[in-house]
Every structure is written in C-alpha cells, then in structure tokens.
Swiss-Prot record:
UniProt protein name: D-inositol 3-phosphate glycosyltransferase
InterPro entries, per the entry: Glyco_trans_1 (IPR001296), Glyco_trans_4-like_N (IPR028098), Mycothiol_biosynthesis_MshA (IPR017814)
Subunit structure: Homodimer.
Superkingdom per UniProt: Bacteria
Annotated Mg(2+) binding sites: 325-326, 328, 352
Sites where the protein binds 1D-myo-inositol 3-phosphate: 38, 49-54, 107, 140, 164, 184
Positions annotated to bind UDP-N-acetyl-alpha-D-glucosamine: 44-45, 52, 258, 263, 316, 338, 346
Key words of the record: Glycosyltransferase, Magnesium, Metal-binding, Transferase
Catalytic activity: 1D-myo-inositol 3-phosphate + UDP-N-acetyl-alpha-D-glucosamine = 1D-myo-inositol 2-acetamido-2-deoxy-alpha-D-glucopyranoside 3-phosphate + UDP + H(+)
Pfam family, one: Glyco_trans_4_4
Function recorded in the entry: Catalyzes the transfer of a N-acetyl-glucosamine moiety to 1D-myo-inositol 3-phosphate to produce 1D-myo-inositol 2-acetamido-2-deoxy-glucopyranoside 3-phosphate in the mycothiol biosynthesis pathway.
UniProt-listed Enzyme Commission number(s): 2.4.1.250
Amino acid sequence: MCCALGPGGEPSCKDDRVRHDDVFRLNEPRRVAVLAVHTSPLAQPGTGDAGGMNVYVLQTALHLARRGIEVEIFTRATASADPPVQRVAPGVLVRNVVAGPFEGLDKYDLPTQLCAFAAGVLRAEASHEPGYYDIVHSHYWLSGQVGWLARDRWAVPLVHTAHTLAAVKNAALAQGDSPEPPLRTVGEQQVVDEADRLIVNTDDEARQLISIHHADPARIDVVHPGVDLDVFRPGDRRAARAALGLPLDKDIVAFVGRIQPLKAPDIVLRAAAKLPGVRIVVAGGPSGTGLASPDGLARLADELGISARVTFLPPQSRPNLATLFQAANLVAVPSYSESFGLVALEAQACGTPVAAAAVGGLPVAVRDGVTGTLVAGHDVDHWADALAGLLRAPAPAAAAMSRAAAAHAATFSWDHTTDALLASYRRAIREYTTERRGVGA
C-alpha cells in the first residue's frame, strides 16, 4: 500500500501493484503522461510556436479526463511566474518544467535542454507511487526524445504524434523560409523507431511516415483531430461583423494563423489585391522566421496599395475566433505544409467556406467544391480566381456550401478523436504487455 498526493492535492492510497497489473490486464489506461516540450497547451494559439498542436493537446486531455482518465501534461516553463503545477480542470494537470532560461530560447535551441527537461519529468514521476503512469504520449519530435527515456524508465508504452515532419516541410519551403536542420530529421527517425505506436492525422501523413522514415504500417493509427462544436458554430454574419467593427456591406476574406512564411499569409494579400473592394482580416502573431520581420505583412499591404482594406488583429480567443469566422465570407488557408489544418475545420464549423492549399491534411479537412475550394500550388492568379469564385457564387449555391461546411465539420468532434485515441492507447498497452513484458498471448 502506498500513499501519495493525487493530481488535485488529495491523499491517494492504493495498492499500486494491483492497479498497474489491472491496467495491463484490461488494456485500459488510468493515468497518461503527456509531453509537450516546446509549447504549452495553455499558450494562445497564433503566438510564438502555439498553434493547432496546442489545441489538440488541451482538448484531448480534457476529453480523456471526462472519461475518468487522469492526464498530466509536461511542458517547459517559459516565465518565472509559471507555477510548477496548474490544475486546468478536474483530472488535468499541467506541469511547467524548468529547463533552461525562461526567455530567449528559440525552438531550435531546445535540444540542448532536453536533458534538463527529462530530469524534471523523472523527478515529478518519482514523487508519485511506483507505476503511477500507464502510458506516455509525446507530441512533436523533441517530446518524443524525452518520451523514449520515460518509456524505458517507467516500463510503459510510448505513443507518439509527430504533428509535422522535417522532410515534408523542407520539400515545400516558402521563398525566404529556413529549412529544418538535419538534427531534427535524425531525432525524428529515432523516435519513429522507438515509439510503440505512432498517431497521425491522416492517411497521407501515414504514407509519409512509411516512405520517409520506414515506419511499420502496423504501428500507425490514423486519428483525425476534432473541433469544439459548442464554440465553433454558425451565427449571424451581420451581428458578428457589428461585434468586430467590420463593414456590413463588403466581402471579407479572413486569414487566421501564425505570421510566418510557412502559413503564406502574403498569398492572401497578393490575391486579394487583385479583387477590388474585398476586405482582408489577418488574425495572428509573428512566429518562426516571421519574427525576423514582424511588420513585414503590414509593409506588404502598403506596397500593394491595400492597407485601407486590411485589418490586422492579434491572436484571438476561441469565442472571438468563432465570431471572426462567422463574420467572414470565406477563410483562406494557403499553407505550404499542413499536417491537418484545424483552422479550416473551425471555420467550416461556423458555416464559412474555406479556400485551402491542396497540401497535407487539408484535402481531408476541406471537401473540394462542396465545403470550399482546394488550390494547387501558390500562384497568386490561381488564388485570386479561387477567392473570386467563392465570393461571387450565387446566393443559393453559397448557402448550400455554408450548410455543407457546417455538416462536414460536425463529423470531426473531439469525442470522435478521443474514441480513436483511446483505441490506440489500448493497442499500445496490449502490444507492450505481450511483446515487452511477456504477459498475455
């Protein structure tokens, strides 16, 4: 019998040997250690390195907790004010691990701090009774490196989600963008080789893992991300525009995301510049190589002579983002690389059609010709034609596309994501039990 503090600080006294054996006999996880080294799930999407992955980590944790599974998320502390532990919701903790200086570390510097981060993770686990976690789920390759160590130390399976791959990003670099370093490619290969199961967003991403990193197809699970249908839902366009102070009588194209070459916000401005009278709303903050020129997009708007037609907004809260999607005639997602594209899904959940690049997971998130338009390549004229086609659609066709967009997005709930995630966890535990512990048949 071992007594320790539970996730909420309450005493927890259990015969852990029995509990852990039950987990591996029943293939049911009770506690999950989630690793998100380079960005906190509590960070505002659209700032720094925060984006779809942050939303994914937080939403899956919340939904797992609602099913009685405790989740502890480990992320690197980025401010001295970050508390060591934050209770986000019943059953969900975020542990801010001190690993390196709080400020001034770029994501590409973080490999130098993985040892410090891993030490913090192991210390946290040591404060619990032995066998506290039943599974480790790492997000992004940096976390996978730490998850590899934790898996071996704790004797539990490692599930890994890459979110993006260096080789895929490097094959589709925007002009002026910097390639991912060889170090990352090596690190990703190691994690793919070591993980017990690999979770991908789409079948296309599964094929990439197999062709680039020679992943075993039998160890890959396709789990589509979801959308919060309570927040992102159709609304009154005029009311949404009034709330945001946007004109009621103009066509509006919205871009939402981090301001960096990878996301291609410049394509939206250049294409919209060819469409007289169209207003553009850009919501997001500079990130990655975009930090080198945080005002670059505003300067581009000035050079194109459309500054009066462009509204720049900082990263928005989820309710405000839903209002922006409701206000827009369409949302543009012209990324050069996108493993899925949650923004496209969230926009469609609000009944707003999407013009998206035909890359990565976007052909899954957007049904071409039904819920929006997929654009091959990044030719500005092609993008201008795509935007114009959606904006000039007859009212009945536009209304039908809006309904189809909302219906399509409704099939991607976080409950569905959690069902598939738990199925992957169960497979990981069952296989780990059989292959590594020699238990079962």
